[in-house]
UniProtKB/Swiss-Prot annotation:
UniProt membrane topology term: Single-pass type IV membrane protein
Residues passing through the membrane, by range: 231-248
Null allele phenotype: No visible phenotype and no effect on drought stress response, probably due to the redundancy with RMA2 and RMA3.
Protein name per Swiss-Prot or TrEMBL: E3 ubiquitin-protein ligase RMA1
Domain notes: The RING-type zinc finger domain is required for E3 ligase activity.
Gene Ontology CC terms: endoplasmic reticulum; endoplasmic reticulum membrane; membrane
Subcellular location: Endoplasmic reticulum membrane
Amino acid sequence: MALDQSFEDAALLGELYGEGAFCFKSKKPEPITVSVPSDDTDDSNFDCNICLDSVQEPVVTLCGHLFCWPCIHKWLDVQSFSTSDEYQRHRQCPVCKSKVSHSTLVPLYGRGRCTTQEEGKNSVPKRPVGPVYRLEMPNSPYASTDLRLSQRVHFNSPQEGYYPVSGVMSSNSLSYSAVLDPVMVMVGEMVATRLFGTRVMDRFAYPDTYNLAGTSGPRMRRRIMQADKSLGRIFFFFMCCVVLCLLLF
């Protein structure tokens, strides 16, 4: 019964709307067009704050405002100012009134339009390279002076046991006598003097140590005498061992 009712309904619709009421024609889907902005209109969000046009050779200030380089150059041109008030006004950002100069402009590359040859004939120089922050290098005269003073104070303190480095040696390297213990250096000199009869240590590696105020005191002399006695005993014991070895073997 339900099937017969559906056929009757279809026949009534065919009489009302004609034979083509249930004929579905195959149509191709219409292509969806998406508007993609071109390169010429891509700079619509990057407008100059002076000419309100797409930026040409864009530069940005430290306060974050974008300008064309020709526009901001004309704004900062000090030769066309007549009064000091006008000069001070044009030394400020046109938007936020913060200080602006040619040295604080940062160029932007890869955006905006470039100047053509006809536009380049105007008296507009090239864009600035941006602010340059110079760091004080260690080889500057002030830094080298501070380094020499700190080294002089460090090596001339007698209570720490340091000794001055010879002027021939570089300030970046440590001398041989500053690394070793001065007592060990003196012991080595005494051993060399007793064994070979001459002083082997170079004076440039251990310069004028005995002429210092810290080494000419009674405490240092007493230490030298004790080291000399100890070396004498060690040398005597060593010679006895050598003689015994020669006699036994």
